[in-house]
């Protein structure tokens, strides 16, 4: 994951 990425639709 890139830095500052918000885990929103992580399956």
From Swiss-Prot:
This is [Thr6]-phyllokinin. May produce in vitro relaxation of rat arterial smooth muscle and constriction of intestinal smooth muscle. May target bradykinin receptors (BDKRB). The modification 4-hydroxyproline is found at residue 3. It comes from the Eukaryota. GO terms for biological process: defense response. Keywords: Amphibian defense peptide, Bradykinin receptor impairing toxin, G-protein coupled receptor impairing toxin, Hydroxylation, Secreted, Sulfation, Toxin. Expressed by the skin glands. GO terms for cellular component: extracellular region. Belongs to the bradykinin-related peptide family. The modification Sulfotyrosine is found at residue 11. It is found in: Secreted. One of its GO terms (molecular function) is toxin activity. It comes from Physalaemus nattereri.
């Amino acid at each position: 994951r890139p830095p500052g990425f918000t885990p929103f639709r992580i399956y």
